[in-house]
UniProtKB/Swiss-Prot annotation:
The protein's role, per its UniProt record: Carries out a dual function: signal transduction and activation of transcription. Mediates cellular responses to the cytokine KITLG/SCF and other growth factors. May mediate cellular responses to activated FGFR1, FGFR2, FGFR3 and FGFR4. Binds to the GAS element and activates PRL-induced transcription. Regulates the expression of milk proteins during lactation.
Post-translational modification remark: ISGylated. Tyrosine phosphorylated in response to KITLG/SCF, IL2, IL3, IL7, IL15, CSF2/GMCSF, GH1, PRL, EPO and THPO. Activated KIT promotes phosphorylation on tyrosine residues and subsequent translocation to the nucleus. Tyrosine phosphorylated in response to constitutively activated FGFR1, FGFR2, FGFR3 and FGFR4. Tyrosine phosphorylation is required for DNA-binding activity and dimerization. Serine phosphorylation is also required for maximal transcriptional activity.
Subunit details: Forms a homodimer or a heterodimer with a related family member. Binds NR3C1. Interacts with NCOA1 and SOCS7. Interacts with ERBB4. Interacts with EBF4. Interacts with CD69.
Subcellular location: Cytoplasm; Nucleus
GO BP annotations listed: cell surface receptor signaling pathway via JAK-STAT; cytokine-mediated signaling pathway; defense response; development of secondary female sexual characteristics; female pregnancy; growth hormone receptor signaling pathway via JAK-STAT; lactation; lipid storage
Lineage, highest ranks first: Eukaryota, Metazoa, Chordata, Craniata, Vertebrata
Designated name of the protein: Signal transducer and activator of transcription 5A
UniProt source species: Bos taurus
Recorded family membership: Belongs to the transcription factor STAT family.
Top-rank taxon: Eukaryota
A Pfam family assignment: STAT_linker
All copies of domain SH2, residue ranges: 589-686
Length: 794
């Protein structure tokens, strides 16, 4: 019930958005009186696409109806009488609505609960700046709702005026028929005698003159009514067009932009419910006005009166048709975009939705939607209305889907769940452009009939640009193309034009957004991190971020040309950082344990005055996705050391925390945090007992130059091998199998190569699994392989 309590505290626009969620499909009173029961049911456990879950959905429907009936029976007193009737009515209504489609009830309640939670979360997480933004947004939404109220009133006014015009015209026609009857009576006067004819003729003439004068005046009045009504419709359509522009060209375009940025890791684009409610109100008012205009045209045809009205009505009729055409074609949107990096022969999904499908009764004749993949050039031709019918650049399997109307949520949508790109036809590439820079788009098209087939619309919508790959190795460069396009695409562009150069601060914003999303962290890129990246990209030594604000970055600098002195591009290096953090080091990054964006010289400057054993973790310059340890330790040869970088492959063998735990001479995480305080919760527990007489070997990180230091600092800490009570463990002299490896594992810069020690480790593991009797006791043990410390080398 806590969710409903929080939802009731929503204010302003958030409260209005919550109210939109409810209606006849699920009354808000049911949510209120059954809040605790509703929130305790397993709505999310039901798979809406699995027919076998229908029985569970039916049980939930029956439970809901029973709870409502019980709640109704418990109502007593004068105030409870009306509530008892109302709750009983709701129980019957829900039973009748969902009896044949219980899955729709589940879909409806899940939709409501999800959006309630989202609104509460957004309200709770809003900062002061976000509050200002929400206030501005609420003000804008308030203005939209006020305009709808104004449109409702003027539409009601023209409806009243139309009825008055119709009544006036009907009375005019009656009087006109009376005039014709008088004229017929004049023809009959010839049959009367002269005296009687003269008497009757005088009376008829007076009546005719009076009636003709009235008809003339009334015809002018009718014409005036018609002109005034047409003018009112013109003003209504001006207001309608203005409101539609705000909703379609501002609000809907902003939603699409948020959807595009969400592809780069930006905040979710948000629900379409408010937009749909606005579009449905537009559709309703537009249709009411269209019907009024058609009735006015019928009245004019019924009683033609020369004047400007026919031309005015033709104009407003054409205008209202344009407005409704724009509404229908613009509200056919892609709710769930296909993946923007699209691999051939791989299943993918997408969802399209018509925001006005319910109000315009499009669902009465469910339309079919077809998806095809087209090239950038074909997309340009399509928007120019050039003849590109049936042209495509590949073959998509399962590319047709019928739109379904979900009564509970009022949505008309088509869910493509099992599409697959079978093949792709590429265009001739330009200059240095690679296949991962070539953009395609998925075209969704359909045909909608509106108003009993009065109007038929051919609708099309294009997905965000997609890059097609055939191998996973192309994914990183394809992602760079998508990132650049999503970040820097301008509204209303020609497909898929994007600036070749952007300012460094613009790129910083895009990189930070992507970084936080990929690493799934609120700890984004700091000012110091961005300075480091700028130095790397521009090959500069300036340490002031402001010095880079006016500098431009080209696409070639970003991911076509290698960085000076290296065999990789800027994006490839940055993407490698995100990859290793995402796969192995999210908690360490969030803990602030990884400094990361510092070079070797900066690490030297940071550590030089620190106590021995102080270390930091930084991203390697020489190895994409590599992390190296730099530490302070005075020796006759040097006082700063750098371990050869670890990569994703290394961390899949032994975690970073365990490797650091093995190196006992690493004591403080820069600047002065005890290592175990930071990393001990991530150490792999050491098992003390053998299983079935066998002990499980472990790999241990060892740096030969520091074996003595490690042993001294480890003191008397027992290893797993020492602690194991298994009888299979023989005295240490029995492990004299290999002489010490004479090759150093620290390079001339003090970097340790893990690969050169891993072969030894694997060989030892193999020997540990052999029977003890087969071991040769004559060989001396390799120095440092079985030193006391955390874990054992296997």
């Amino acid at each position: 019930m806590a969710g409903w309590i929080q939802a009731q505290q929503l204010q302003g626009d958030a409260l209005r958005q919550m109210q939109v969620l409810y209606g006849q499909h699920f009354p808000i009173e049911v949510r209120h009186y059954l809040a605790q029961w509703i929130e305790s049911q397993p709505w999310d456990a039901i798979d809406l696409d699995n027919p076998q879950d229908r029985a569970q959905a039916t049980q939930l429907l029956e439970g809901l109806v029973q709870e409502l009936q019980k709640k109704a029976e418990h109502q007593v007193g004068e105030d409870g009488f009306l509530l008892k009737i109302k709750l009983g009515h709701y129980a019957t209504q829900l039973q009748n609505t969902y009896d044949r489609c219980p899955m729709e009830l589940v879909r409806c309640i899940r939709h409501i609960l999800y959006n309630e939670q989202r609104l509460v979360r957004e309200a709770n997480n809003g900062s002061s700046s976000a509050g200002i933004l929400v206030d501005a947004m609420s003000q804008k939404h308030l203005q939209i709702n006020q305009t709808f109220e104004e449109l409702r009133l003027v539409t009601q006014d023209t409806e009243n005026e139309l009825k008055k015009l119709q009544q006036t015209q009907e009375y005019f026609i009656i009087q006109y028929q009376e005039s014709l009857r008088i004229q017929a009576q004049f023809a009959q006067l010839a049959q009367l005698n002269p005296q009687e004819r003269l008497s009757r003729e005088t009376a008829l003439q007076q009546k005719q003159v009076s009636l003709e004068a009235w008809l003339q005046r009334e015809a002018q009045t009718l014409q005036q009514y018609r002109v005034e009504l047409a003018e009112k419709h013109q003003k209504t359509l001006q207001l309608l067009r203005k409101q539609q522009t705000i909703i379609l060209d501002d609000e809907l375009i902003q939603w699409k932009r948020r959807q595009q940025l969400a592809g780069n890791g930006g905040p979710p684009e948000g629900s379409l419910d408010v937009l749909q409610s606005w579009c449905e109100k537009l559709a309703e008012i537009i249709w009411q006005n269209r019907q009024q205009i058609r009735r006015a045209e019928h009245l004019c045809q019924q009683l033609p009166i020369p004047g400007p009205v026919e031309e005015m009505l033709a104009e407003v009729n054409a205008t209202i048709t344009d407005i409704i055409s724009a509404l229908v074609t613009s509200t056919f949107i892609i709710e769930k975009q296909p993946p923007q990096v699209l691999k051939t022969q791989t299943k993918f999904a997408a969802t399209v939705r018509l925001l006005v499908g319910g109000k315009l009764n499009v669902h009465m004749n469910p339309p079919q939607v077809k998806a095809t993949i087209i090239s950038e050039q074909q997309a340009k031709s399509l928007l120019k209305n050039e003849n590109t019918r049936n042209e495509c650049s590949g073959e998509i399997l399962n590319n047709c889907c019928v739109m379904e109307y979900h009564q509970a949520t009022g949505t008309l949508s088509a869910h493509f769940r099992n599409m697959s790109l079978k093949r792709i036809k590429r265009a001739d590439r330009r200059g240095a452009e690679s296949v991962t820079e070539e953009k395609f788009t998925v075209l969704f098209e359909s045909q909608f009939s509106v108003g009993s087939n009065e109007l038929v619309f051919q609708v099309k919508t294009l997905s965000l640009p997609v890059v097609v790959i055939v191998h996973g190795s192309q994914d990183h460069n394809a992602t760079a193309t998508v990132l650049w396009d999503n970040a820097f695409a301008e509204p209303g562009r020609v497909p898929f034009a994007v600036p070749d150069k952007v300012l460094w601060p613009q790129l910083c914003e895009a990189l930070n957004m992507k970084f936080k999303a990929e690493v799934q962290s609120n700890r984004g890129l700091t000012k110091e991190n961005l300075v480091f990246l700028a130095q790397k990209l521009f090959n500069s030594s300036s340490s002031h971020l402001e010095d880079y604000n006016g500098m431009s970055v080209s696409w070639s600098q970003f991911n076509r040309e290698n960085l000076p002195g290296w065999n990789y591009t800027f994006w490839q290096w940055f993407d490698g950082v995100m990859e290793v953090l995402k796969k192995h080091h999210k908690p360490h990054w969030n803990d602030g344990a990884i400094l990361g964006f510092v070079n070797k010289q900066q690490a030297h400057d940071l550590l030089i005055n620190k106590p021995d054993g102080t270390f930091l973790l930084r991203f390697s310059d020489s190895e994409i996705g590599g992390i190296t340890i730099a530490w302070k330790f005075d020796s006759p040869d040097r006082n700063l050391w750098n371990l050869k970088p670890f990569t994703t492959r290394d961390f899949s063998i032994r975690s970073l925390a365990d490797r650091l735990g093995d190196l006992n001479y690493l004591i403080y995480v820069f600047p002065d945090r005890p290592k175990d305080e930071v990393f001990s919760k991530y150490y792999t527990p050491v098992l003390a007992k053998a299983v079935d007489g066998y002990v499980k070997p472990q790999i241990k990180q060892v740096v030969p130059e520091f074996v003595s230091a490690s042993a001294d600092s480890a003191g008397s800490n027992a290893t797993y091998m020492d602690q194991a009570p298994s009888p299979a463990v023989c005295p240490q002299p029995h492990y004299n199998m290999y002489p010490q490896n004479p090759d150093p594992v620290l390079d001339q810069d003090g970097e340790f190569d893990l690969d050169e020690t891993m072969d030894v480790a694997r060989h030892v593991e193999e020997l540990l699994r052999r029977p003890m009797d087969s071991l040769e006791p004559s060989l001396p043990p390799p120095t440092g392989l079985f030193t006391p410390g955390r874990g054992s080398l296997s």
